[in-house]
Amino acid sequence: MDVDSGDGPVVNLLWTGGWDSTFRLLQLILDTRATIQPVYVIDTERLSSLIEMQTMDRIKRGVVERFPRAEGRILPHRFFSIHDIAEDATITESYLRLARRWHLGSQYDWLPRLAKQHGLGALEMSVVADSRPRGGIVQCL
């Protein structure tokens, strides 16, 4: 399979090296002409952060080795610290309103704040079909 050059849109992808976000990365590389801007939030409280960063590096090298034309389509990672994400009362109020109705992880508060703070516009996040959030909440995100 050959990979097209990236003359399509830039997609901001929250990529952790997990299988769900890696699937989306590969889907964008193989099925579209998009350029991927990987985004990763460093949380020093999470012990898996270093492993995830090493995994993403290995995956990216493997993709480029297998599909050399993909190299220019995966931009260098943008890394952000969770501790540097600015507060935003409007976003947090919306999150709390939704969290009263559905069980939501705190990332649904700080990810939109990150996107707004850094002008990321749309920020794609992969969610495994059998994990939360479910049902009506997906339409609210």
In which residue ranges do the predicted regions lie?
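ATP-dependent adenylation/nucleotidyltransferase module used to activate substrates
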Residues: M1-L141
